[in-house]
Amino acid sequence: MKREVIHAPGVPAPLAHYCQGVVAGDTIYAAGQIASDYRTSVPAEARVDPAFPYYGSEIQRQTRYILENIRKTFQAAGADLADVVKAQVFLTDLADFFHFDQVWKEFFPSPPPRTTVQISGLLVPGCRVEIDLVGVRRHVKREVIRADGVPAPLAHYCQGVIVGDTIYAAGQIASDYRTGVPAEARVDPAFPYYGSDIQRQTRYILENIRRTFRAAGADLADVVKAQVFLTDLTDFFHFDQVWKEFFPSPPPRTTVQVSGLLVPGCRVEIDLIGVGRHVKREVIRADGVPAPLAHYCQGVVAGDTIYAAGQIASNYRTGVPAEARVDPAFPYYGSDIERQTRYILENVRKTFQAAGADLADVVKAQVFLTDLRDFFYFDQVWKEFFPSPPPRTTVQVSGLLVPGCRVEIDLVAVRG
């Protein structure tokens, strides 16, 4: 499939090793953007004048700055923000959300599906939000999904969109948007030892997302990519038991801990991508890649698109293996983050090669670091594996599923 790197005039050039965006076929994958010009940190037009602190909103200025830049990126690809079909929003403080959403409405009169979580840090101090968008060219047919029985969101987004053969669903949490977490998604406080909040919430969410997929002429068996945002990783094992009920043949999955979700009491947000039932897909089984302990697969090929599971530096036998960590007897002779990044990318490369592709075919990358101070050293290894880098989103999260792991990498590729 034909790929083209986007070079949009007027958009700040990144300091790190990634590109503004890639067009693969008719799909536009944009890099996550923050409100920085990469010269002066947060530029004057994206912040409130400290001499007049009550005459403006930082989050609104930053959101507007970002969306104006992303619009230029999409326009350079022959599209516009009206062509966005999936959005992910990473806020450093959920108290900013309401004011963020007011600006979102200005740019998206007909909004795309969206996932919003709170993360613990962004790469430029003072930045309050990172926005990650996927779109399509203007001529591509799309249809908004309206599923009966699924709670209508309070905020400005839709349940999902069908774009050609792909189904993009909004991230869902266990809320009816009337009472917070509804009774059926929580344990009765009078009987606290007779149930599991995370299992009830997971079941509530997946039943709703199943309705969304069925309204699109598909089902959960047609999911080809999952991202799971937990507020507490100690919930993971019990979450995964419910996941097995809904996904006998599981999709690739990325799981990270975030620091907050938009409704108090919600413990998990689930973000899914699917394809139409007629689309040929194949589960990837790559030799030499550690078999996961949990219920997901290494990756799926759907049409020409390859969705890989998020990977961390674990062999799932000994935690972080020796080759992915510095010998504690020689702590100053190596870098944990560089070793972990190399370990992960070598494994992901095997996954892509088993699917008839390579890292040169990656069109979208998301990087979840547990400590942003690792970023510079991470990026040095990234350059080795990606001489011509894909668009990338990088955020700091609160935790990963194996203690000692410092980064999770989530990649999507398109076969050439």
Which residues fall in each region the model found?
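N-terminal presequence-like segments and the immediate start of the first folded domain
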Residues: 1-68, 72-85, 90-207, 211-225, ...
